[in-house]
From Swiss-Prot:
Gene assigned in the entry: dapB
Record-annotated active site: S724 (charge relay system), D801 (charge relay system), H834 (charge relay system)
Purpose of the protein: Type IV dipeptidyl-peptidase which removes N-terminal dipeptides sequentially from polypeptides having unsubstituted N-termini provided that the penultimate residue is proline.
Bias (Basic and acidic residues): 1-26
Name the record gives this protein: Probable dipeptidyl-aminopeptidase B
Species this protein is from: Pyrenophora tritici-repentis (strain Pt-1C-BFP) (Wheat tan spot fungus)
Length: 880
């Protein structure tokens, strides 16, 4: 289930002493004496009216330069001018004595302050390196700032590739500037004065003319020798629509899909060879159907070349038994087809093969094509899953061995099989089976990070093997399986933390594995390396401090593109890895313009913390208004997503709608990653299985009660909102809470009944409805009487949502109608899908959320409960 589309997502020490931190100590200050250094206290308050004798303006009054009569005597620039008074020697001597005594006293006080424990290091403060705490320190964040991309961090579009002769450190750079669209460059030359001459230019411009048409590439693949020239893929059908194209590893052939059939073009010939012939509207070759693209591959490719280019693996997808869901378009015609005469005023209907929970799934089988023999074949497995109980989630060629690893699960995603096939012998066997239903009652997430490790006896690797994610003592880690049919791994990482999309790269020369993990904090990401024997774990970036880092590694593992994503201003640099002989470091992006823009804005204070609910520690992010005052009472908005394995509380730099609410409207915004979310271990994650919505809602309510008890929170003004799964959990929370804690809620594109959502996602967490009818009933939003006990809630949905169908909101509205519940508002968006973008809709969503929330916290929705005509109110007042 994808999240809503919001402003791009997606504060710590920098990696080198030469680089400045994103926010210096002069920029971040607290009003609490116990949480700042005495030095900053003195410097900050030199001009404080309470110290120098001037009077403060009363709370609520705007700052003005026109001070009263009593103030003028103390002002030099703004007050009445008075001639300076001369000071004699005796007076100056006494001033020196008093000054020295003051400095001595201050020094003694500082020593006492530090020794007494009153001083708190910066790490103990709320994590707010970019926050504004000085009144009038900047401009307010606006909606135009957020949605206009002004807080977007620049990232250079780079991709590591291997050189023709195995060179390491080559970058494929897209849109590189200097009128060059696509270039290959050695990173060691990047930025040099004469680097332009050392670049290999693959494409000068971003497009070109073909037979009178201007063509722009959607994707590019460099040939192995960087010397291929552009020409039509199919000379006989140059204008034909191509659904997918894939270049062979040797850059000598292209396999492509057209009209759901597969074709092969060998580049030394103009001939196009048709591989399959029975593809059609319900049978696909080499590309996934809707549910596999959405929930498994998240791409339109289901085609895999062998490393030697002699075989092609591909999926055959038969969705003939999958039921159809109609999506209606009332304003536009996405197909581009002209309506038939007389049907101009009817909506266009797009019929999607959409398997809902419990419905028939597409039948997916793995097939192979022998390029030399021009033959399609399959490999039979003795103990394979039945066709209607099999999900194929990953294909990995085992180097040049003509073997392939296939990852499969059962329909409910709790039994995993790793199958090893030999395409030359056309045999296969299951080499590894895991059952997490028996282990911890959980599930397997879809993953495509399995990495083949070839044998190299001279380098200590006797047999071929592969690296895969494993479950080790309740956490996701990485293991090395060797030989290929071994089901017992060498454990490469371990601890009460988890790896993330690992491994990132394997350095075969030095037997080093690189990966990203949450070892320092579940809210952070850092890069690590470990040897293939499981020893020598070390951090790739020394002294990285607190932060959220991404890393991509060169083909040979000698270089890494490090992307610091927050919480401070993001930056990018390329460094040499510890295994590299030559030390190298080059800053690519510092986002100086963004840094200046942020410093001119009043930013929210970010307070990262954990709370305990039912013995589980949950991550929380509290966003406070820039000039937070504990003596005030603030309304609180809870924003969450809460989906299985997701994470919202992380230390990325992210100025979004929530930041706007906190910084501009001056509401507190809290995000809680409750049970079921990711990166805190399987015990916390898998407890929700079979009953999603219960623990997620329970934890939001528990957190809300904690905040409601805080002195600075107005307990009568608590609201919650979310999109997609977050919309579902918003409604589930309001249903479970029944107005006791939360008074308001806003749900966008929510699931209201999991029987309406797609099979692969839903059954992973809920089993099938046939096997868990009670769980589905519990997870459905049905208790409308409890929803009626909330002050008010808001529903929004895109009419053309092909992901979370409008059916979800409409069936809930019907339940509300039947029960006579009316304390809600509804807004639907014609022709908008799950992201709600059509015809300015996305901005309208957030404008609606903003104004609706303001009215809620202003008490307007409470008045509606007893609304009556103004004339009647006036008449009643007159009678009194």
């Amino acid at each position: 289930m994808p999240r809503q589309r919001a402003p791009k997502e997606e504060e710590a020490e920098l990696l080198t002493k030469q680089e400045r931190s994103a926010r210096s100590s002069e920029d971040a200050s607290d009003t609490s004496i116990s949480s700042i250094s005495t030095t900053s206290l003195v410097l900050e308050h030199i001009n404080d009216p309470a110290i120098n004798g001037t009077s403060r303006s009363r709370r609520g009054e705007k700052y003005t330069d026109e001070d009263d009569e009593a103030q003028e005597a103390f002002d030099v620039e703004g007050g009445r001018y008075k001639s300076p008074i001369s000071v004699d020697k005796k007076t100056r001597r006494w001033l020196w004595i008093v000054g020295i005594a003051c400095v001595t006293g201050w020094a003694l006080a500082l020593v006492f302050f530090l020794m007494s424990g009153s001083y708190k290091h910066v790490s103990t403060r709320p994590h707010d390196p970019l926050a504004s705490s000085t009144k009038g320190s900047g401009k307010k964040i606006t909606m135009d700032d957020v949605f206009g991309g002004r807080f977007y961090a620049r990232e250079q579009s780079l991709k590591w590739i291997a050189g023709p002769n195995g060179e390491d450190g080559l970058l494929l750079e897209r849109d590189a500037g200097n009128a060059e669209y696509l270039v290959v460059e050695d990173i060691r030359n990047k930025g040099d004065g004469d680097s332009s001459a050392k670049k290999t230019k693959l494409m000068q411009k971003s497009g070109f003319n073909v037979n009178g048409y201007f063509v722009r590439p959607v994707e590019v693949w460099p040939s192995k020798d960087f010397k291929k020239t552009g020409e039509p893929l199919d000379p006989e059908n140059q204008d034909g629509r191509v659904q997918l194209a894939s270049l062979s590893p040797q850059s000598d052939a292209v396999v492509f899909t057209r009209n759901n059939n597969m074709y092969l073009r060998k580049l030394d010939s103009k001939e196009v060879i048709q591989i399959t012939r029975d593809g059609g509207s319900e049978l696909f070759y080499g590309i996934p159907d809707w549910v596999y693209e959405e929930e498994v591959f998240q791409t339109n490719s289901a085609t895999w070349w062998s490393e030697d280019g002699k075989y092609i693996a591909f999926l055959r997808t038969d969705e003939s038994t999958v039921p159809t869901y109609p999506v209606q378009y009332f304003v536009s015609r996405p197909s581009g087809d002209k309506p038939k005469a007389g049907e101009e005023n009817y909506p266009e209907v797009r019929n999607i093969k959409y398997p809902k929970a419990g419905a028939p799934n597409p039948i997916v089988t793995l097939q192979f094509y022998d390029v030399e023999k021009a033959e399609v074949f399959s490999v039979e497995i003795e103990d394979d899953f039945r066709d209607n109980n099999r999900l194929i989630t990953e294909i990995v060629w085992a180097g040049k061995t003509k073997q392939v690893l296939v990852r499969e699960t059962n329909r409910e995603s709790d039994i995993l099989k790793v199958v090893l096939m030999d395409v030359e012998k056309r045999t296969g066997k299951t080499v590894r089976t895991e059952n997490v239903a028996e282990l911890d009652g959980g599930w397997f997430e879809v993953s495509q990070k399995t990495t083949f490790v070839p044998a190299d006896p001279a380098n200590g690797r006797k047999d071929d093997g592969y690296i895969d994610t494993i479950i080790h003592e309740g956490y996701d880690h990485i293991g090395y399986f060797t030989p290929l049919d071994n089901d017992k791994p060498i454990v490469l990482s371990q601890g009460e933390w988890e790896v993330v999309d690992a491994p990132s790269r394997v350095d075969l020369k030095n037997n080093i594995v690189y990966y990203i993990s949450t070892a320092k904090s579940s809210m952070e990401r850092h890069a690590y390396s470990v040897f293939l024997n499981g020893t020598g774990t070390s951090e790739v970036v020394e002294n990285s401090g607190s932060g959220y880092y991404g890393a991509s590694f060169s083909a040979g593992g000698s270089y890494a593109l490090i992307t610091y994503q927050g919480p401070g201003i993001p930056w990018q640099k390329i460094i040499s890895t510890p295994s590299s002989k030559d030390k190298f470091e080059k800053v690519l992006e510092e986002n100086k313009a963004l840094d200046r823009f942020v410093r001119e804005r009043e930013m929210p204070i970010l307070n990262y913390q954990t709370i305990e609910v039912d013995g589980f520690k949950l991550n929380v992010l509290e966003r406070r208004p820039p000039h937070f005052n504990e003596k005030k009472k603030y309304p609180v908005l809870f924003y969450q997503y809460s989906g299985p394995g997701s994470q919202e509380v992380n230390k990325k730099f992210h100025v979004d709608f929530q930041a706007y609410i906190a910084a501009n409207l001056e509401y507190i915004v809290v995000t809680v990653d409750g049970r079921g979310t990711g990166f805190l271990g399987r015990k916390l994650r898998c407890i929700t299985r079979g009953n999603i919505g219960y623990y997620e809602a329970h934890d939001q309510i528990a957190a809300a009660k904690i905040w409601a008890s805080k002195k600075y929170v107005d307990a009568d003004r608590l609201a919650i909102w979310g999109w997609s799964y977050g919309g579902f959990n918003t409604l589930k929370t309001l249903e479970q809470d029944a107005g006791q804690t939360f008074k308001y809620g806003m749900a966008v594109a929510p699931v209201t009944d999991w029987r309406y959502y797609d099979s692969i996602y839903t059954e992973r967490y809920m089993h099938t409805p046939q096997n868990n009818a009670a769980g589905y009933n519990n997870s459905t939003i049905t208790d409308v009487a409890s929803l009626a006990k909330n002050t008010r809630f808001l529903l929004m949905h895109g009419v053309a949502d092909d992901n979370v169908h409008m059916q979800n909101t409409l069936t809930l509205l019907d339940r509300l109608d039947l029960a006579g519940v009316e304390n809600y508002d509804v807004h639907v968006f014609p022709d908008s899908d799950h992201s709600i973008y059509f015809h300015n809709a996305n901005r309208i969503v957030y404008d609606k959320l903003r104004w609706w929330l303001i009215n809620a916290f202003n008490g307007e929705w409470a008045k509606i409960k007893t609304a009556e005509p103004k004339a009647q109110v006036d008449a009643r007042m007159e009678r009194r």
